[in-house]
Amino acid sequence: MANKKMILYQLKIDKFKDSNETGYGDYKGLLLQIKYFQFLQIDGIILNNILDYYKNAKSLAEIESKYGSILEFKKMINIYNSNNIKMGINLDFNNLRDTFNNWKQAKILHENKNFTPNQTQKNAFEKYIDKNNKENDIFLNQTEFLDFYNKIFDFYLNLGCNFFVININNENSKNNNINEKEIDLIKNIYKISKQKNESFEIIIKTKNHELHKIQASQKEKIYDFLFIDKFSEIGSDKTYKNKLMIKFKPWQLLKELRNYLSYEDVIISLASEHIGRINSRWGDELAFNKEASKSFALLLLAARNSANIYYGDELGLLKAKIEDYRDFNEFNYNETKRYLETKNISTDIFYNSYLYQHSISVNNIMPWNLEPNFGFSKIKNKKFIFAENSKQNNVVSEFNDPTSSLNFYKYLIEFIKNKDFEEILNNGKISFSKDVFKKGIIKIKYKLQNKKLLFVINISKKSRKIHLSKKYEIIKSTYHDKKYLNIPNSLDPFESLILLKK
């Protein structure tokens, strides 16, 4: 995967596809959907850390009845690998001690699978589980954490996984600067991983490109890719830890993205698992939902950077359909509401922000079709949270609609992998026009000899005047049915173009 632009797809296993009518997405369910990723031509998939399933588990049956067995997970991984799709794990170093304890619990349950839960607790639990209550700081005791990492690495390597996305962001940190201890840890992680398996990829999740500058000053590599998803926070009030929604300013997103678009080893994710759907927060929930989703696809895929698609965004999914505040399933909901009331923030503003911002909007069930539970599960009498436009924007409906967001994603991925455009995309000089940022527009231009390829991406809800050379030819638009007799002098809301000049 190194030194080559790649397209990743991030998902939650338990929300993706249920194969056994338990109401939980499982390993077999994910395997059943392999053709979906072949259709999209995805290079790799980021999975949630399955060791989390073992937290407080009393028996293997409890886990395997929901998600499947470790052998089923390994089979699923191997089949994806044999189809040239890499499989990786999202690993949060802020919770590495918890992951290590979960690994030990998994070890206990597998070693004692013929015992009763009480026997397992008595004979093995105390022996293995780490009850150390030290502060969970990955940089305080590096030796200990490297030991944790070794065990977890071996576990996933033996299951056939190909890469880690390692989160080193500390939410409690007062700044995003990387210190010497952090750099030293990253170096050691990379060295350990490559010694065990040279082809295993280390992707570091960070909030800025400082590591990119540090890498340039090093004699040896310290990571394979950077992963940045901080952009999802734009349009949120950081004063209240992203609980409140503020006005989205398209130019702000373009300005932030500009620094990362030139690098194949930087993976950009517009969305993240921690905050609501970008199609609702940044796009248009009414007339221009489809066009907005396509424009975000262009923003993600048109430049030289690698990219991560968060599951459901390729369908143009909107925020979750919430019927009651209890659907948020948040223990401190009322406490947060009362606190914000003391700051003169009304209940209506608070609740509306939750509808758009809450992570449940990006972590609900994947809609496959119009069958019960949108094809996610055949279980009856169980309530699921789903996107409010799942009836219109599910995989089958999108697949059958040539104007859909899903088919536009497929077109774009095929386009950037097309041999006819490979040379200019890989070897052409890339430039970005900043003069139209204030309008919510970015121009990404590739030039190779006399050939020019231009992406004009409008993420504004308003029509915008724009000047484009009449020598270009339009080869694709986010407005599927619009007929262009000439190069336009203005763009409609979320109207974005791909143009070519030979």
What are these regions (language model features)?
Residues 1-472, 476-502:
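Active-site and adjacent substrate-binding regions of carbohydrate-active enzymes
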